[in-house]
């Protein structure tokens, strides 16, 4: 009973010492007392189990300075005072720390177009640029001139049909706008033209001609029957478009109708020229 009680007591003391942090200081003292008891011839009588338990409890009970109240019972599972007090860990305010600049991110999607702004002020005139190279030659422009003057040296008499007066003498025919074979002037330059017709009448015969525009009778040249021949003329201005035709027509022979001329002299003339081009203001 004595050795078993001592074992239980020793285990109880070790638990109390571990809990209170005094195990290292108390274990050698207990071992020394046991050696003294073993060296004596007569061992003291072991105290009662209850008394020894109270004595050990009083010896190893934590003092009031350690923070436990006197009225509180200490159990073997209660935590004791820590042998190594925790040190305060310094705190770092990460909001004041600035890290290194990161890599550039990927390009984002294009945003929507904003509202159109107001027009800015007119800028300053820039410096004069260098002279450019010469361009390619352009197309040849059309001539803005037209003129003709023709004559006839042969007399002409009417018959049962209308006759175009054909001229055999060319005085002026700029750019060949007057066709000597057909006896007609062809308009290649649109604009305002002046025309003049001069004839010599025949004695005792009527003179009856028209200046024609395309197939339209425009003006008449007329002379009644007379004992003497005379020079008769007619003139006018016409506005022509391209491809219009102007010519002279002898009236058909309801009555005897004729114009006089001879090989030695020119008695019949027809002239015309451009006064104003159509594109001119």
UniProtKB/Swiss-Prot annotation:
Keywords: Collagen, Glycoprotein, Secreted, Signal. GO terms for cellular component: collagen trimer; extracellular space; plasma membrane. Glycans are attached at residue 93. This is Complement C1q tumor necrosis factor-related protein 1. Residues 34-68, 100-138 are annotated as: Disordered. Residues 141-281 form the C1q domain. SUPFAM superfamilies: TNF-like. Residues 99-140 form the Collagen-like domain. The keyword Glycoprotein applies. Residues 1-25 form the signal peptide. GO terms for molecular function: collagen binding; identical protein binding. InterPro entries: C1q_dom (IPR001073), Collagen (IPR008160), Collagen/C1q_domain (IPR050392), Tumour_necrosis_fac-like_dom (IPR008983). GO terms for biological process: negative regulation of platelet activation; negative regulation of platelet aggregation; positive regulation of aldosterone secretion; positive regulation of cytosolic calcium ion concentration; positive regulation of gene expression; positive regulation of MAPK cascade; positive regulation of phosphatidylinositol 3-kinase/protein kinase B signal transduction; regulation of glucose metabolic process. It comes from the Eukaryota. Transmembrane segments: none annotated. Residues 48-62, 100-109 have a biased composition (Basic and acidic residues). It is found in: Secreted.
